[in-house]
């Protein structure tokens, strides 16, 4: 669904802190802190995950799955595996 790295990157792009994301999503600050502290895929109550994703998307973030194409317009960034020499 969403990784902790995506959450942190999305917040950075929006220029908001964890408290602001919690308010946008209607969840508690400790919930956001736990989600971002997890390793890899965020696990938790599906309803809570959906609230966070909806808040990020509502603020203009496009979450792109692995090997998926972006449907949005404009410039963006994607993290990929480093190419070996």
Q: PLM ranges: what are they?
A:
Residues 58-85:
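Short, charged recognition helix plus adjacent turn
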Residues 46-63:
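DNA major-groove recognition helix of helix-turn-helix/homeodomain DNA-binding modules
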């Amino acid at each position: 669904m969403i990784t902790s790295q995506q959450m942190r990157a999305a917040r950075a792009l929006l220029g908001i802190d964890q408290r602001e994301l919690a308010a946008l999503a209607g969840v508690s600050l400790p919930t956001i802190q736990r989600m971002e502290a997890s390793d890899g895929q965020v696990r938790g109550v599906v309803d809570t995950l959906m609230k966070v994703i909806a808040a990020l998307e509502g603020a203009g973030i496009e979450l792109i799955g692995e090997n998926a194409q972006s449907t949005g317009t404009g410039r963006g960034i994607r993290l990929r595996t480093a190419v070996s020499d």
